Structures are given as structure tokens and as C-alpha cells.
Amino acid sequence: MTMADVAGKLIDGFVKAFYIAKKDAKVYYFKAPNFTYGFLMPVSLFLAFSIAGQINSALIVSGLTSLVILFATTSIEAVAVVLEKQTGTFERLLVAPVSFFTILFGKALAGLFFGLVLAIAILVPLAVFSGTTIANPVLVLFAIAFSALAFSALGALVSAYAKWVPEAQMLSNFLRFPMAFLSGTFVPLELMPAQLGIIARLLPLTYSVEALRISINDSAPITTYLLDILVLALFSFALLVIAAKVLQRKIE
């Protein structure tokens, strides 16, 4: 197989994934209730910690933006495949010459676009009201995009494993809430006990918060930011590969 053949297959797969993403965006994501839920839980958590005086104002912009991306993308992604398996529409995708990985990548792309829109919708007013100057908007957009892709891939894994919507919702909450408290969203990693700091480095939300904080505040070298983006990309790929294998095993 030549390089041209490989490139052709990659482009063909991406085109198929794009159309799957376009369909999912219309059917699942861009509806008013989804926007509301994407904001509601993260904002509630931050308000609770802010009232208690346990949150540093410098963490609000990056931490809340990351949480909005996490809750918004996983809330829909975690049930999308489950719903399609129950209604029989997922089998229609399998009739086409498309791999399980491509299907899930397309669904994750829809989550990426939705997370990008929601993150910008919360980031801009947060920056204005807090008086925060965004140091590098381009790096912020890349951080949001890779964060949304990683969290969508996590949701895809949950959706591939679950049989029913309540099971998918329970599993996604089981993953989201520990991440929300252990990833430096409310308390900087430097102030955490060493054991919790090690656990935090195993969670994708940690790298999302750190990448956003660096790109917003210019608080660390660019190499740290690039490492965060690389880790988010690796999380995305690994989670999608695992999700594709889980889904294939459960269906076949």
C-alpha cells in the first residue's frame, strides 16, 4: 500500500466522520436543554465553593470553562450510541463501509464542535466580568478543542459500554465528579497532597485546566502547554480505540 493509498483512506474516513458529526450535531447537541445543562452543574459547583470561600478567583476562568466542556460533551456523548442502539439507527451506520473507530470519531467531532461553542459562550463573559485579559486567544481555542475531543471520547467509551441510558448516565457521573474535584479546578495541584497530585495526573481534566490556565494567563512555558495538548490528544485517540473495540465486541 502506497502513501497515496493511506492518505486517501484517511481523508475518506475523515469525510465520513464529518458527516456523522454533522448528523449528531443536529439530532443531539444544538438544542436549548443541552446548553442549559452544560452550564448548570459546573456553575452550581463553582458557586458552592465560591460562597464557602474555598476557591481562588484566578482559577475561575480556566476551571469553570473546563468543567463546562466536560459536562456538556459527556452528557450527550455518553447516551448517543445507547439511544441509537435501542432505536436501531446505529445498525444503519454499520451497513455503510465505515469502521467502528470512524463512527465514534465522528460522534466525538460533534462533541468537539458543541464544546467549542459552549466554552466560548462561558469564557467571554467570565473574562469580561472578572477583568481577565486572555494572553493568547489562539492557544485558548486549541486547548478548548482538544479538551472537548478528549471528553467526547470519554463519553463515547461510556456509551459504547452501557446498555441503557440510566446506566450511561450513572457511569458518566461516576467519572465526572471525581475528576471535577481532583483535577485542579477548585484547588491548585500544588496545594494538593502528593498522592492526590499523582492521581490528578492520570485524569484528562487536569491537562485541560492547565492548558487553559497557561493560554489565558501566560503562567508557564509554552512547552508545558504543548505537553498538555499532546496528552489530551493521546487520551482522545486511546479512548476512541478502546471504545471502538468495546462497541464491536458488544455488537458482534
Residue ranges, per PLM feature:
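Transmembrane helix-boundary elements of multi-pass transport/secretion proteins
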Residues: 6-9, 13-16, 20-87, 115, ...
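Hydrophobic alpha-helical transmembrane segments of multi-pass membrane transport proteins
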Residues: 44, 58-126, 155, 174, ...
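Alpha-helical transmembrane segments and their short interhelical loops
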Residues: 100-172, 222-233, 237-243
